[in-house]
Curated annotation (Swiss-Prot):
Stated name of the protein: Phosphoglycerate kinase
GO MF assignments: ADP binding; ATP binding; phosphoglycerate kinase activity
Enzyme's top EC category: transferase
Gene name in the database record: pgk
GO process annotations (BP): gluconeogenesis; glycolytic process
Annotated GO CC locations: cytosol
Alphabetical keyword list: ATP-binding, Cytoplasm, Glycolysis, Kinase, Nucleotide-binding, Transferase
Quaternary context: Monomer.
EC number(s) reported in the record: 2.7.2.3
Binding site for substrate: D22, F23, N24, R37, H60, L61, G62, R63, R119, R152
Length: 393
């Protein structure tokens, strides 16, 4: 099912386009430390400007818990947008109310304003109808380009669409196209690389991708629960004991479906979970009882490289080791390079895998770098995202 996009809307000229973006960017001492999500919104903003729209941007930032907290103000985003667009992006002091609506009504074609954080109101996350109606008064048409928040049925992602004609922006369209393609009709061989620390947060994705993949690579902290379920010793590594049976039945199902599962065959371990710990190589599935698994070893990487080289489609979500500690980031870094050099369709999603791709300047070699963390996960789990559902044709 495809979605309606900005190209399906007749005329934006002179109209206020209320654009829901995902400007939930990391801030360090009030400065934006990664502007990927802001840059991802630019194609839609530029298109609307070209078409003569008056652009009213809305977003959330952080978790202010329904109260006005200037620590979570979108002011730094307005400054960054002004710089990137080469025009003044006016920051308004609220997101609802007569004064704000009057400001939007006085805009000229091509003007861009940013409203204050929608999560300064508790009604936003409750998808309160009255709040959604007040938000909608700032626009004549609603454009949802916030894929990163599409899995949330909030007032600014879903509620507003009850009051305004609604279409998706280019980012929303791109995410829906690439992730949808992978789930519906992937070119084969199709390799899913799933990392991260917990089985509990990734098991639904693994189960959804299992029936579609030819190879599933499991890495990161969650791999140790899978190894334990096969009878290997994992030392002091992370173990989710309540998921041992689930891991075991997943591996059994993979065998029945003739899907190859790659688990770590060797490890980089440490005495304790610390960025200053000394890395030590273990050439075995088994980890000594006083050690913690921190990254995959060279043999595992060679196995992964073999399947990546012949892959026609790759989806990668989650790191293969403790990526945030430099000494244990090699596995994730090498997989990032392997995925980037693959000639097939490559999709990377999830905070740490995206960070790895960006850190090594490889994002332009990936077919699609997904901007949605939780949203990408839920999409890959096969869930219908509320923010996308309201845009379907």
């Amino acid at each position: 099912m495809s979605i309606k996009t900005v190209k399906d809307f007749n005329s934006f000229a002179g109209k206020r386009a209320l654009v829901r973006c995902d400007f939930n960017v990391p801030l360090k001492e009030g400065n934006i430390s990664d502007d990927t999500r802001i840059k991802a919104a630019l194609p839609t903003i530029e298109y609307l400007k070209e078409k003569g729209a008056r652009i009213v941007l809305i977003s959330h930032l952080g978790r202010p818990e329904g109260k006005k907290n200037l620590k979570y103000s979108l002011k730094p985003v307005a400054n960054k947008l002004s710089e990137l667009l080469g025009q003044d992006v006016k920051m308004l002091s609220d997101c609802i109310g007569r004064e704000i609506v009057n400001n939007t009504l006085q805009m000229k074609d091509g003007d861009v304003v940013l409203l204050e954080n929608v999560r300064f109101y508790a009604e936003e996350e409750k998808n309160d109808k009255n709040f959604a109606k007040k938000l909608s008064e700032n626009g004549d048409v609603f454009v949802n380009d916030a894929f990163g928040a599409a899995h949330r049925a909030h007032a600014s992602t879903v509620g507003v669409s009850d009051y305004l004609p609604s279409v998706g922006g280019f980012l929303m369209e791109k995410e829906d196209k690439f992730l949808g393609e992978v789930l519906k009709n992937p070119e084969r061989p199709f390799v899913s690389i799933i990392g991260g620390s917990k089985v509990s947060s990734k098991i639904a994705v693994l189960e959804s991708l299992l029936s579609k993949s030819n190879v599933v690579v499991i890495g990161g902290g969650m791999a140790y629960t899978f190894l334990h379920s096969k009878g290997y010793s994992i030392g002091k590594s992370l173990l989710e004991s309540e998921y041992i049976d689930i891991a075991s039945s997943f591996l059994k199902k993979a065998k029945e479906l003739d899907v190859k599962v790659i688990l770590p065959l060797d490890h980089i371990v440490a005495d304790d979970f610390n960025k200053n710990s000394t890395p030590e190589y273990i050439d075995s599935f088994d980890i000594p009882e006083n050690k913690i698994g921190m990254d995959v070893g060279g043999k595992t990487l060679k196995e992964i490289e073999k399947v990546i080289k012949t892959a026609k489609t790759i989806i990668w979500n989650g790191p293969l080791g403790v990526f945030e500690f430099d000494s244990f980031s090699k596995g994730t870094a090498m997989v990032a390079e392997m995925v980037a050099s693959c000639a097939g369709l490559t999709i990377v999603g999830g905070g740490d895998s995206v960070a790895a791709v960006n850190k090594f300047n490889l994002s332009d070699k990936i077919t699609h770098v997904s901007t949605g963390g939780g949203a990408s996960l839920e999409y890959l789990e096969g869930k219908i995202l509320p923010g996308i559902k309201v845009l379907e044709k």
